[in-house]
């Protein structure tokens, strides 16, 4: 079975210090990076990968003032970038979705999770537990009483949608290998690799455990050798320029 359509859905932008994308650089220059959600249309129903930024980031570039990342992370989010508004533009309401897949629980990937009261939210146990106790996770990204589906390790969500446990950027990060009708296999590294440079040249970037992150990149390289997928990175400005976005699909 394959995924009928894979949509790239823009979900705002984020200014991030370039040293977060390349740890060998001296902090002080901000990059304007894309924030993505991904919509999968499958035989079983629609699946959303990541939910963008939280409502607290709307028109609030100073969201992280007074924190350890002040001046290094500046969200650029409008009302239109709220996940409920994004879904409306693509023809869905929150209750229509079969699953939410949280690649990890950082603010630009899980900020909209609270819009999904009943929809199962698939997240790695290591990520769920880390988010309970670390200041780098916003409360909007780890709300209680949501319908969390806790998994451990690799996991097939539906036929054609495989989660790959790729820790390092965070303790429980997961990437996706998707078999699409139109384009064949597609690998979404998400934040296991921000950019092509991180992936191909193994340039270090921001994360919880740099050695673990490198191990995950090496693992994904093995997947690429075996499956020959199209590879999309988490926040690659160069790749964004040629990316097909909704209503186009791959």
Curated annotation (Swiss-Prot):
Consequence of substituting residue 104 to S: No effect on activity on N-beta-oxooctanoyl-L-homoserine lactone. Reduces activity on N-beta-oxooctanoyl-L-homoserine lactone by 48.9%. Abolishes activity on N-beta-oxooctanoyl-L-homoserine lactone
Gene3D superfamilies assigned to the protein according to its UniProt record, in alphabetical order: Ribonuclease Z/Hydroxyacylglutathione hydrolase-like
Substitution effect: residue 109 to S: Results in a conformational change. Abolishes activity on N-beta-oxooctanoyl-L-homoserine lactone and acyl homoserine lactone. Abolishes activity on N-beta-oxooctanoyl-L-homoserine lactone
Listed CDD domains: AHL_lactonase_MBL-fold (cd07729)
Consequence when changing residue 109 to L: Reduces activity on N-beta-oxooctanoyl-L-homoserine lactone by 62.1%
List of residues binding Zn(2+) 2: 108-109, 191, 235
Top-level division of the source organism's lineage: Bacteria
Cofactor, free-text remark: Binds 2 Zn(2+) ions per subunit.
Recorded catalytic activity of this chain's protein: an N-acyl-L-homoserine lactone + H2O = an N-acyl-L-homoserine + H(+)
InterPro entries: AHLLactAiiA, MBL_superfamily_lactonases, Metallo-B-lactamas, RibonucZ/Hydroxyglut_hydro
Residues that coordinate or bind Zn(2+) 1: 104, 106, 169, 191
Noted pH dependence of activity: Optimum pH is 8.0 with 3-oxo-C8-HSL as substrate. Activity increases with increase in pH from 6.0 to 8.0, and declines slightly at pH 9.0. Little or no activity at pH 5.0 or below.
Temperature-activity note from the record: Stable below 37 degrees Celsius, activity decreases sharply after incubation for 2 hours at 45 degrees Celsius.
Enzyme Commission number(s) of this protein: 3.1.1.81
Keywords: Hydrolase, Metal-binding, Zinc
Coiled-coil boundaries: none
Key word Lyase present: no
Gene Ontology MF annotations: acyl-L-homoserine-lactone lactonohydrolase activity; metal ion binding
Protein activity control: Completely inhibited by Cu(2+) and Ag(+). Partially inhibited by Cr(2+), Pb(2+) and Fe(2+). Mg(2+), Ca(2+), Mn(2+), Co(2+), Ni(2+), Zn(2+) and Cd(2+) have no effect on activity. The chelating agents EDTA, 2,2'bipyridine and o-phenanthroline have no effect on enzyme activity.
Keyword presence, Zinc: yes
Chain's role: Hydrolyzes acyl homoserine lactones with varying lengths of acyl chains, with a slight preference for substrates without 3-oxo substitution at the C3 position. Has only residual activity towards non-acyl lactones, and no activity towards non-cyclic esters.
Quaternary structure note: Monomer.
Family stated for the protein in its record: Belongs to the metallo-beta-lactamase superfamily.
PANTHER family: METALLO-HYDROLASE RV2300C-RELATED, QUORUM-QUENCHING LACTONASE YTNP-RELATED-RELATED
Official protein name in the record: N-acyl homoserine lactonase
């Amino acid at each position: 079975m394959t995924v009928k359509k894979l949509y790239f859905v823009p979900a705002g932008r984020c200014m991030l210090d370039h040293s977060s994308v390349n740890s060998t650089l001296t902090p002080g220059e901000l990059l304007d990076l894309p924030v993505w959600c991904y919509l999968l249309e499958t035989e079983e129903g629609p699946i959303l990968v990541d939910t963008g930024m939280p409502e607290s980031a709307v028109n609030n570039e100073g969201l992280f003032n007074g924190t350890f990342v002040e001046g290094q992370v500046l969200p650029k989010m409008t009302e239109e970038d709220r996940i409920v508004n994004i879904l409306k533009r693509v023809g869905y309401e929150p209750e229509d979705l079969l699953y939410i897949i949280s690649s990890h629980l950082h603010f630009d990937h899980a900020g909209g999770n609270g819009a999904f009261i009943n929809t199962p939210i698939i997240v790695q146990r290591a990520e769920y537990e880390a988010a309970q106790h670390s200041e780098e996770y916003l409360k909007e990204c780890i709300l209680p009483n949501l319908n969390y589906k806790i998994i451990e390790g690799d996991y097939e969500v539906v036929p054609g949608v495989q989660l790959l446990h790729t820790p390092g950027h965070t303790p429980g990060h997961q990437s996706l290998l998707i078999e699409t009708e139109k384009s064949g296999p597609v690998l979404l590294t998400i934040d296991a690799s921000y950019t092509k440079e991180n992936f191909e040249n193994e340039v270090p970037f921001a994360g919880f455990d740099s050695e673990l992150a490198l191990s995950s990149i090496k693992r994904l390289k093995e997947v690429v050798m075996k499956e020959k997928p199209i590879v999309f990175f988490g926040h690659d400005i160069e790749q964004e320029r040629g990316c097909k976005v909704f209503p186009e699909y791959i």
